[in-house]
UniProtKB/Swiss-Prot annotation:
This is Bcl-2-like protein 12. Keywords: Apoptosis, Methylation, Phosphoprotein. The gene is BCL2L12. Residues 24-46 are annotated as: Disordered. GO terms for molecular function: p53 binding. The keyword Phosphoprotein applies. A motif (BH2) lies at residues 227-238. GO terms for biological process: apoptotic process; negative regulation of apoptotic process; negative regulation of cellular senescence; negative regulation of intrinsic apoptotic signaling pathway in response to DNA damage by p53 class mediator; positive regulation of transcription by RNA polymerase II.
């Protein structure tokens, strides 16, 4: 994937994620927000908050590289060849589709793998964190406020531990989920799309916790970039996995 094309897709993904976070707040389920000093106040704009989670070259004020001046200009019609930029309504529609997928996934309990005894103390802590993240934002806030040690473990996770946290959070017991006919053709690969939706849900649940956790969650969402690109970008994904208008989410 060309560098400029990848950066453009990552920017689109950030906008989808910002719209997804905005849906959660509008629905009355704000992300966890531990107390901060005035010097630690986060920007209220979701997109700005997400960019602060990324390395400078990918998020905070990265200056676009200057293109060399062309020697000639192509002769082509000025209409009908390339789509215009996506609108806020488009990102909101993608976020709505992802929200529907999240609701479908969360109807199923966590994987039976979580029922057995943990093999290590580290695994036990990660399972405890997953159980915490299954709660509503208000409950997460209350438990983290009463257990600073647990919050410290959560915001200081290593990348390897976070990868395991993602694996546990996204593992669902498919046997308990009723089958439901979806309108239109099925998505090109339902499992990656469902995992991507859950990755955004995890980002929503940890977005206000600070530390390295928010950045790791956003980078995990960006790890789906090759898959998104292979299926025609967000436009292609929405075209083959449309919003189910029979689910009144708004």
């Amino acid at each position: 994937m060309a560098g400029s094309e990848e950066l453009g897709l990552r920017e689109d993904t950030l906008r989808v994620l910002a719209a997804f976070l905005r849906r959660g707040e509008a629905a009355g389920s704000p992300v966890p927000t531990p107390p901060r000093s005035p010097a630690q106040e986060e920007p209220t704009d979701f997109l700005s908050r997400l960019r602060r989670c990324l390395p400078c070259s990918l998020g905070r004020g990265a200056a676009p590289s200057e293109s060399p001046r062309p020697c000639s200009l192509p002769i082509r019609p000025c209409y009908g060849l390339e789509p215009g930029p996506a609108t806020p309504d488009f990102y909101a529609l993608v976020a709505q589709r992802l929200e529907q997928l999240v609701q479908e996934q969360l109807k199923s309990p966590p994987s039976p793998e979580l029922q057995g005894p943990p093999s290590t103390e580290k695994e036990a802590i990660l399972r405890r964190l997953v159980a915490l993240l299954e709660e509503e934002a208000e409950v997460i806030n209350q438990k983290l406020a009463s257990d600073p040690a647990l919050r410290s473990k959560l915001v200081r996770l290593s990348s390897d531990s976070f990868a395991r946290l993602v694996e546990l959070f996204c593992s669902r017991d498919d046997s308990s989920r009723p089958s439901r006919a979806c309108p239109g053709p099925p998505p090109p690969s339902p499992e990656p799309l469902a995992r991507l939706a859950l990755a955004m849900e995890l980002s929503r649940r940890v977005a206000g916790l600070g530390g390295t956790l928010a950045g790791l969650s956003v980078e995990h969402v960006h790890s789906f970039t090759p898959w998104i690109q292979a299926h025609g970008g967000w436009e292609g994904i929405l075209a083959v996995s449309p919003v189910d208008l029979n689910l009144p989410l708004d």
